[in-house]
C-alpha cells in the first residue's frame, strides 16, 4: 500500500494507492490499484474530541457515514465514501440537524438533482471533519464480484479514516482509547473489518458497525457520504466520456440503457467495461 499524507494548514490531505489487500490473513494482489483520497480537519477533530469527552467524562463518539455509488452500471468503477460531519450536524434527517447550515438541503443523493449534488459536493468536503473516497476499478470488480468490491471499498474507507484519526489523536497526546466510533453503513450488511489492524490502532473494542437500510435517506452522515460517492463517480464518467464520446457515457453514466448497449454493439467493449457483467460477457462472445 502506497500512502501519502500532506498537511496544509490544519487540513490533512489523504492519498492512498492499494495494490495488495489482506483478507482474513491472506494477501491478495489486486488486478488494478484501488485509489483513495480524502481529508481530515485536524483542529476540528481535536475540538470535537475534547468537547465530547468533557461532556461525557468517558468517551468521544464520532459517527462515520459510509455509502457507495455505481453498483449497477456495466462500465467503470464503483465508488465508496466515508464522511464525518460535525457532531451537531450528524443525526436522523427527520430531526433536521442540518437546518440553517450550509448543508440544509442534504438528503439521499438519488433524490437530488445533479445540479444540487454538484453544489453540495464541495460543501460536504469543506464542512466535514473528515472524509475518504475510494475508487474501485472495473478490473477489481471482475476479480472479486461487485458485492465484494463494494464491501472492500466500504472497509477501506472506514479503516483509512480510523487510521488517520487514531494516528493524529496519538500525535496530539490524546488518549485514543477514549474514541468511540459508530460506523453507519448504508444497506443491509456491514463489511468485515481487519480486526488485527484495529488492534494495532487501539480501537478494536470501540468500533460499532451498524447497517442502515435506506440509510442515505435517513441519516445525515450517510447522506453526506452518498453525495461524495455519487459525484466522484460521475466525475470519472465524464472523464471517460471525453475519451470515448461515441459511447454517450455522459448521459447514461455506464448504466445498461438502450443507447449504451447499441454503442457497445457498434464500437465494442472498452477496457473500463465490467467483463463479469452478463451484457458485457455476451457482447464479448459475438
From Swiss-Prot:
Record InterPro entries: RNase_HII, RNase_HII/HIII, RNase_HII/HIII_dom, RNaseH-like_sf, RNaseH_sf
Keyword set, alphabetical order: Cytoplasm, Endonuclease, Hydrolase, Manganese, Metal-binding, Nuclease
Record note on cofactor: Manganese or magnesium. Binds 1 divalent metal ion per monomer in the absence of substrate. May bind a second metal ion after substrate binding.
Enzyme class: hydrolase
Cofactor: Mn(2+); Mg(2+)
UniProt EC number: 3.1.26.4
Protein's UniProt keywords contain Transport: no
Disulphides: none
Residue ranges annotated for the RNase H type-2 domain, each copy included: 61-286
GO terms, molecular function: manganese ion binding; RNA binding; RNA-DNA hybrid ribonuclease activity
Amino acids binding a divalent metal cation: 67-68, 186
Top-level taxon of origin: Bacteria
GO (cellular component) term, any one: cytoplasm
Subcellular localization: Cytoplasm
A biological-process GO annotation: DNA replication, removal of RNA primer
Reaction(s) the record says it catalyses: Endonucleolytic cleavage to 5'-phosphomonoester
Pfam families (UniProt xref): RNase_HII (PF01351)
Function: Endonuclease that specifically degrades the RNA of RNA-DNA hybrids.
Membership in a protein family: Belongs to the RNase HII family.
HAMAP family: RNase_HII_B
Protein name per the record: Ribonuclease HII
Amino acid at each position: 500500500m502506497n500512502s501519502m499524507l500532506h498537511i496544509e494548514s490544519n487540513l490533512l490531505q489523504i492519498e492512498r494507492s492499494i495494490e495488495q489487500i489482506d483478507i482474513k490473513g491472506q494477501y491478495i494482489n489486486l488486478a488494478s490499484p484501488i485509489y483513495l483520497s480524502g481529508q481530515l480537519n485536524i483542529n476540528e477533530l481535536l475540538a470535537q474530541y475534547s468537547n465530547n469527552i468533557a461532556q461525557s467524562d468517558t468517551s468521544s463518539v464520532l459517527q462515520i457515514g459510509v455509502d457507495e455509488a455505481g453498483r449497477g452500471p456495466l462500465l467503470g468503477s464503483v465508488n465508496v465514501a466515508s464522511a464525518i460531519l460535525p457532531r451537531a450536524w450528524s443525526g436522523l434527517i427527520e430531526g433536521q440537524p442540518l437546518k440553517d447550515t450550509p448543508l440544509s438541503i442534504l438528503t439521499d443523493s438519488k433524490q437530488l438533482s445533479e445540479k444540487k449534488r454538484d453544489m453540495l459536493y464541495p460543501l460536504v468536503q469543506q464542512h466535514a471533519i473528515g472524509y475518504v473516497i475510494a475508487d474501485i476499478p472495473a478490473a477489481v470488480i471482475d476479480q472479486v464480484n461487485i458485492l465484494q468490491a463494494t464491501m472492500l471499498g466500504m472497509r477501506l474507507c472506514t479503516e483509512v479514516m480510523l487510521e488517520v484519526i487514531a494516528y493524529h489523536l496519538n500525535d496530539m497526546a490524546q488518549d485514543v482509547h477514549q474514541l468511540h466510533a459508530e460506523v453507519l453503513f448504508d444497506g443491509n450488511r456491514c463489511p468485515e473489518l481487519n480486526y488485527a489492524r484495529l488492534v494495532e490502532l487501539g480501537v478494536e473494542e470501540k468500533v460499532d458497525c451498524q447497517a442502515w437500510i435506506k440509510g442515505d435517506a435517513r441519516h445525515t452522515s450517510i447522506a453526506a457520504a452518498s453525495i461524495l460517492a455519487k459525484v466522484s463517480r460521475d466525475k470519472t464518467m465524464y472523464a471517460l466520456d471525453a475519451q470515448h464520446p461515441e459511447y454517450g457515457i455522459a448521459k447514461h453514466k455506464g448504466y445498461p440503457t438502450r443507447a449504451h448497449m447499441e454503442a457497445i454493439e457498434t464500437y465494442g467493449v472498452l477496457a473500463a467495461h465490467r467483463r463479469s457483467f452478463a451484457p458485457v460477457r455476451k457482447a464479448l462472445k459475438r
